[in-house]
Structures are given as C-alpha cells and as structure tokens.
C-alpha cells in the first residue's frame, strides 16, 4: 500500500527550494504600505519572538498571519542576495517557501523603524498539534503515522533547502482540519544547515538532545531526529517523555499508553543516546511502523471530519 502512495506523495519530496532572487520587485516598483494591503485582526499569540495576529489580504480576502518581530529581540541576522540585512527567519522562510505544502509560506515582509513584519499563510480551519492532542488525548497510531510522515517530509524538505528548523515540536505544527495537511511553522530558532557542529540553541529544551544538555554541542541532522522521536512519543502517548535535564541525559523511555512494539522500537531508535546510533530520515521512512501511510485527505475523512473542529487560530 505504501509503494502505491509514494507517487502521490512525491511532490512533497521533490518540491524545489525557493530562489531568493525570484521575489525581488521589478525595477522602479515600490511596495505598497502594509496598511493598504492587509487588514489586521485579533491577536493569535505572543512570546519572546514578538506577536502574531490574524489578518486578511485586502486584494483577495486571503487569510494570513501577521507576525511582528521587534528588532531588539532579534539575535540572528542574515542577508538577502541584494545585500538587505534581515532576520535570519526571513532568509530561512524564503529558502523553504516553494510549491511544497508542508511548510508555512512567507508571502511578504516589511521593515519598520523598530521591527519587521512577516506575512504568512494561514489555513482555515486550523489547530496546532499541541491543542489537538490536549483536546483529544493520545492519537491512534494510524493517525499518528500519517501526521508523523508529513512532519518528516517537511523536515526533509527544509534540509534539502539547506535549512535546520531547530524547534520541532507540537506547538509548531499546524493541522488544516479540512484537508488533513500539516504545516511546519516558526523558523525563529532556525539556522542554515551545515555538516559541522552547532554550539548554540534557541529551541525548546525538552525537545533538545542529550548531547546539547551535556556538552552544549550537537549536529543538525541527528538533533532533528531526536526531536522527531520526542514528537512521535508525544503523539502516541499524549505527552512528552522527558521534563528535566536528568531525564533527557538518562534517556530511559517509559510508555504510558498501549503502543505497538514497532512504534516503540522506532521511538527508542530516534531517542538513542549516541547521535550516531539514530536513524537517518530514509531509515525512519523505511521502518516497518511507517508502512501503509494514509494520504492527508484520507486522514481528514477518517479521523478529522468525524470530530468537532477545535477553535480556529
């Protein structure tokens, strides 16, 4: 069954990375002001990154998310091909925003004297995976498998585009409740992917690998696999496996729900204490538990449409 669906999912894997030059304005064309293009709605959320509001694009009533980031809160900067200095988040989003549907798209951005404003796509109706699990509890393995496959494809797409997300967690995954499609969001902790070691980390500590807790060093790909293991455990058990540094370093996984032996094996493999013992993305997708993956629309029809949608964001 899985092999018959690979072609249906192939567009996710082969989507091209965005050419940063492609979004430049034509010579002599000035960008219209933010206020004339977008109508700002209620606050969706706020934190150390700034604030995110719902909004509407005036030209076509397209739902958008409007993210305000204060300049004095930006710790990592990047540069566009034309030399413009922007938050690294803008650089990363431009690299991954393409025809691939599993990563949130950056539609536009604006610079203000004291902040940057990012215009992002906003599916409707939508709920993040954290709220979805909080309301419904541990997911059935069939649903968890579909969700996990989509997240894995999103992370693979990012890596193929040279981007390391560094904050893979349930709060940063949106579920389109109509289509059954997941989208990876919030690249504010991300970095350009490299083969050498990282010595900085701004993501969520309980999703971070033991090598970061112990040595403040990690490699991007193996750290991402650890976070994916935490996420899969969260899906099938309803909560994360570790809360404290000592638990992360010890790495002992106890299952609070009935979980199949194949799923347990995959989780424990992703959560191997030695980074070199963790699977590659390809090995995860070839794992026995990852076979017979539902397509997003099948997921919506079987698991989502029969449920009452949670509150939209």
Swiss-Prot record:
Record field: catalytic activity: L-seryl-[protein] + ATP = O-phospho-L-seryl-[protein] + ADP + H(+); L-threonyl-[protein] + ATP = O-phospho-L-threonyl-[protein] + ADP + H(+)
Residues that coordinate or bind ATP: 44-52, 67, 121, 128
Family (UniProt): Belongs to the protein kinase superfamily. CAMK Ser/Thr protein kinase family. PIM subfamily.
Enzyme Commission designation: 2.7.11.1
Residues the record lists as Phosphothreonine modifications: 23
Modifications the protein undergoes after translation, according to the UniProt entry: Autophosphorylated. Phosphorylated. Interaction with PPP2CA promotes dephosphorylation.
Subunit note: Interacts with RP9. Interacts with HSP90AA1, this interaction stabilizes PIM1 protein levels. Interacts (ubiquitinated form) with HSP70 and promotes its proteasomal degradation.
Protein name: Serine/threonine-protein kinase pim-1
UniProt enzyme class: transferase
Domain Protein kinase per the UniProt entry, residue ranges: 38-290
Domain of life: Eukaryota
Modified residues (Phosphoserine): 8, 98, 261
Function: Proto-oncogene with serine/threonine kinase activity involved in cell survival and cell proliferation and thus providing a selective advantage in tumorigenesis. Exerts its oncogenic activity through: the regulation of MYC transcriptional activity, the regulation of cell cycle progression and by phosphorylation and inhibition of proapoptotic proteins (BAD, MAP3K5). Phosphorylation of MYC leads to an increase of MYC protein stability and thereby an increase of transcriptional activity.
Localization (cell): Cytoplasm; Nucleus
Keyword Electron transport (UniProt): no
GO molecular function annotations of the record: ATP binding; protein serine kinase activity; protein serine/threonine kinase activity
Keyword Methyltransferase recorded: no
Cofactor(s) required, per the database record: Mg(2+)
Cited Gene3D superfamilies: Phosphorylase Kinase, domain 1 (3.30.200.20), Transferase(Phosphotransferase) domain 1 (1.10.510.10)
Any one cellular-component term (Gene Ontology): nucleus
InterPro entries: Kinase-like_dom_sf (IPR011009), PIM1/2/3 (IPR017348), PIM_Ser/Thr_kinase (IPR051138), Prot_kinase_dom (IPR000719), Protein_kinase_ATP_BS (IPR017441), Ser/Thr_kinase_AS (IPR008271)
Catalytic center residues: 167 (proton acceptor)
UniProt-listed SMART domains: S_TKc
GO BP of this protein: apoptotic process; cellular detoxification; cellular response to type II interferon; negative regulation of apoptotic process; negative regulation of innate immune response; positive regulation of brown fat cell differentiation; positive regulation of TORC1 signaling; protein phosphorylation
